[in-house]
Amino acid sequence: MTSIQQLPILAASVCVRRGDEVLLVQRGKQPGLGKWAFPGGKVKFGETTMQAALRELKEECGISAQIGKMIGLYEVIQADVHFAIACYFARDPDGVIQAGSDAADARWLKVHEIGALALAANIAQVVATSEQFLTISDKSDVLR
């Protein structure tokens, strides 16, 4: 029988774009300490993945944004943890970013710069996928 500890953990994140820049946070704690990732975290009971993505964006970066379509569902399986992460798209957020208590840093980075960073799993792939959303001229096609 599978124990509760062996079940996947549902999480949500948001790929926030501003032209040729992407918002990344440097993780301030495990898992992935020191790696650069999208703002995100575990989904709380009774919360949708979209609500969790918005909450995590506010907690980790101090900003808000209109969350758009889901880019995809990504899995990260490490030695002792299995995450299923719903990743959403957002662009042109409101506010000035400021790293929250569980982020070591938060910043806008040019897409061409992120390859030199220690990235969390799937980040480069999701950034590449997000490019297609930037070419859509009508925001209502991308944002709900």
Give, region by region, the residue ranges found by the protein language model.
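Conserved N-terminal beta-strand and adjoining loop/helix that marks the start
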Residues: 1-22, 73
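Short connector loops at helix/strand junctions that flank enzyme active sites
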Residues: 9-11, 17, 38, 65, ...
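Short loop segments at secondary-structure junctions
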Residues: 19-21, 28, 91-96, 111-113
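Short, glycine/serine-rich, charged loops/turns that create anion-binding
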Residues: 21, 29, 43, 75
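Nudix hydrolase/Nudix homology domain
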Residues: 33-36, 101-144
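The catalytic Nudix box helix
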Residues: 38-70, 88
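Active-site-adjacent beta-strand/loop module that shapes the phosphate/pyrophosphate-binding cleft
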Residues: 74-97, 107
